[in-house]
Amino acid sequence: AGTSAQQISYKYIKVVPIAGALGAEIEGVDIASGVDDKTFDEIHRAWLENNIVYFRDQNLTPAQHVAFARRIGDIHPHLLNKGLENFPEIVEVRKTPTQKLNNGGRWHSDQMYTPKPAKGTMLYSRELPPVGGDTMFSNQYLAYDMISEGLKKTLGGLKGVHNGDSRNHPSGLTRMERAKSGLGTIPQVDPGDAQIVSAHPLVRTHPETGRKALYVGSHTESIEGWSHAESEPLLNYLKEFTHRPEFTCRVRWTKGMLTFWDNRCTQHFAVNDYQGHQRIIHKIMIQGDTPF
């Protein structure tokens, strides 16, 4: 979408696109001072139009972070990660100077393995390395639009099986094994009886925009009803295809930045290029619906 058309359509905020595929900075909003309904409605529309938006120079307490997230919807509890003691809605994503692996260092959409995956994720930067630690995003509407008509038909009735604790992490360990070995960057909890393996359509329809998007990521282990050997060639192709450079944008963090993306039509990747430095991000996820 052209910037001029977008700018004309916003009265209360300024929306500055950061790439051709997706992503925009929203200017002129101080979340801590309160956001009125008209401004919030425009923020919500900018989020749907750009898939990922961010606000620089915000000075938020954890309570303000939670309150702003609740305006989007109910909080999605993280089944495998422990929240902050006084704010269980917030998961602290911390990588220390001595840790080698980071959290989110593979292309994925949050909570794909739950029956109702998080529709949105809201991250607030608390501490950053001097350089590095960017997050990359990929537009899954575009990925779907660009596959052939034949492949669209093939994918139409298929579901992907997503596992929240598989060994397809770079370490070769499950989450619980990483936590016990000190490789995890977030305190882990045992999910108990909670469901962390779910099947969802490989092509999902966005409930608010009506657009179709590919829904495949690093959590996707197989295609429902197919063997792993049968699933692997198609899934490997899709996993590579979904983050072609022309579908992506790259967000460079600054301290006090709030970034908010739509998990229903994007994937993201946390770049692990700041060894020897600390990075602390506060993460809240918004409850979604069953993908269809």
Which residue stretches match the model-derived regions?
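Non-heme Fe(II) oxygenase catalytic core, chiefly the N-lobe of the double-stranded beta-helix
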Residues: 1-258, 263-292
